[in-house]
């Protein structure tokens, strides 16, 4: 299983949101490039970077900073406001390893398909963030500010027809809470779509959570707030 550190950016700083709420932001003193270099030295194989300003505004705001983070040598999967072919191509040309497409996959399927065809499916990660309502995982969009009526299963089934294999799924209720991930959700995801390389995010607390997710068939975990805790060794998580 791949262990991927997450770096969320807001106004050029490293931050974390609680349950995706922009009014519950924790800002960290470390600078993003220093944070990326730190993970590079510890042996990280990939970084997950989110431009929260872009996710909220609908247009990526911090591509220059993300490109600077790439100079650490770690492949980056990045998203937050990629909502046009032009911006997708700009990110790809800048060397971003995989583009993370979120809200657009729900709000504009035609444009998303065009991006997939231009960039190639293997270079895309669909980020599908859900709120579980009466056991049905419904998707949230626009930096989690709005809810959609589309279910996770409907959207995955649709894009699978276009070659998408990499999907990052977050249960918003777990994100930033450090109470554990939604194991039932990920178990269902792997059972319904075993051919998808699922990435799990939200609520992961310790090595046992990661081990359990691996036993369910999850391909990668995204670690955010957990890696800011003093008692967590990223090097040990890689072992």
UniProtKB/Swiss-Prot annotation:
- Predominant cellular place of this UniProt entry's protein: cytoplasm
The EC number(s) this enzyme carries: 5.3.1.16
What positions does UniProt annotate as the active site of this protein? 8, 129
Lineage: superkingdom: Bacteria
State a single Gene Ontology molecular function.
1-(5-phosphoribosyl)-5-[(5-phosphoribosylamino)methylideneamino]imidazole-4-carboxamide isomerase activity
- Catalysed reaction per UniProt? 1-(5-phospho-beta-D-ribosyl)-5-[(5-phospho-beta-D-ribosylamino)methylideneamino]imidazole-4-carboxamide = 5-[(5-phospho-1-deoxy-D-ribulos-1-ylimino)methylamino]-1-(5-phospho-beta-D-ribosyl)imidazole-4-carboxamide
One matching Pfam family is: His_biosynth
UniProt pathway:
Amino-acid biosynthesis; L-histidine biosynthesis; L-histidine from 5-phospho-alpha-D-ribose 1-diphosphate: step 4/9
Keyword set, alphabetical order: Amino-acid biosynthesis, Cytoplasm, Histidine biosynthesis, Isomerase
Keyword check for Cytoplasm: yes
State where the protein is found: Cytoplasm
Q: What is a single cellular component term in the Gene Ontology annotation?
A: cytoplasm
A biological process from GO? L-tryptophan biosynthetic process
Q: Which HAMAP family match?
A: HisA
**PANTHER family attached to this UniProt entry:** 1-(5-PHOSPHORIBOSYL)-5-[(5-PHOSPHORIBOSYLAMINO)METHYLIDENEAMINO] IMIDAZOLE-4-CARBOXAMIDE ISOMERASE
Family assignment from sequence similarity: Belongs to the HisA/HisF family.
List the protein's name. 1-(5-phosphoribosyl)-5-[(5-phosphoribosylamino)methylideneamino] imidazole-4-carboxamide isomerase
UniProt lists the gene as hisA
